[in-house]
Amino acid sequence: MRIIFYLTLLLFIFNKVKSDNCTIGGLTATSCNETSQQYYFTQDKFTSEDIIQIPFGAKLYFSGDVVFNYPVNFNCQPSLKKELSRFVYEIDCLQVFSNGTITYNAEEIYCSVDFSTVFDIDTMVDKPVDMVESWSRFMKPTKGFGETKVYEPVVYSRIKAQAGYKCDFNPGFRTSRRVPDKYALHSKCAWAKALFPAGDFNIRITPCNLQNNSESVRKLEEIGFDKNFYMEKLDFTPTDGLFYNGNRESIYIRYYPNFEKKFDLSSIQDIFDSYLYIINYCEDNPNKFEISFGMQSDLWDHRAFNLTDFQLVKNVNGTFEGSATRNQISIMVLILSVLLVLIL
């Protein structure tokens, strides 16, 4: 009995010491149980000050309101669930709980999904498999986002597939067929099939004052790019894949990895052609405009988005042609100067 008592005491002391260091994803909790990965925050209002990385299996409990001003990275894994006579995979990335409201003001939310344990590689599946129709409650808390000006944030996907498989990611705030009041992340995985890469476009239109031109905004909405391939960024009002930001007079388009449509400069020519009638509809000097766009090929690392060195301008016959920007010219001048110095 004495031995059991001392063992219990040692376990209590050990757990107490562990709980004194309640740091999770860059946050320090008021208390925690590290064994069960449960972390408790007792503030009346919690506001994030940096990017938060929530490890797989961890749960964060907040007593009051929560405001995420910086990106949050959730980590989750599919689990089998029996539905009627069949089994389906389901992902529930619920890792943040609050007695108050949860508001996402962050530019992005990330969702890391581990699919590596899902497939039986011996089956050699030769067609896309509808692997996950998940409902992810972090995307829209029960009590809403709090502020009406806060739009639903983008979810980046970091998909880890089993060897030989590749998975696409069709994001969106589409209602789950199985759980109508929840939103779904849809993904398909295929064996030995080409997966086209992802990319970003930040299209700036000048001199159109779209913010004060309701007709132009309506024209933008009529384009309706395929929402399976395009997604909004925070502060962009969603339509069917095309998103308008009145403050910056720009359009942001995100192209996710997919099995069906290759992402390259030529594939978006039709997109720019579609803007012709929109731009010409603008009241401010409709015959003079230019479109510049930025491109980022890797969405899986958190990097600042920068406008790149490619610019499109309208020429006399109404088509688009590429032209180097001042940055390109400056770099070329610098290189030539260095070469001349070396030669002389």
UniProtKB/Swiss-Prot annotation:
* UniProt keyword list: Cell membrane, Glycoprotein, GPI-anchor, Lipoprotein, Membrane, Signal
Q: Name the residues of the propeptide.
A: 323-344
Membrane topology field:
Lipid-anchor; GPI-anchor
Localization: Cell membrane
Q: Where is the signal peptide?
A: 1-19
GO cellular component annotations of the record: plasma membrane; side of membrane
**What is this protein called in UniProt?**
putative uncharacterized GPI-anchored protein DDB_G0275411
Source species of the chain = Dictyostelium discoideum (Social amoeba)
Tell me the organism's taxonomic lineage: Eukaryota, Amoebozoa, Evosea, Eumycetozoa, Dictyostelia
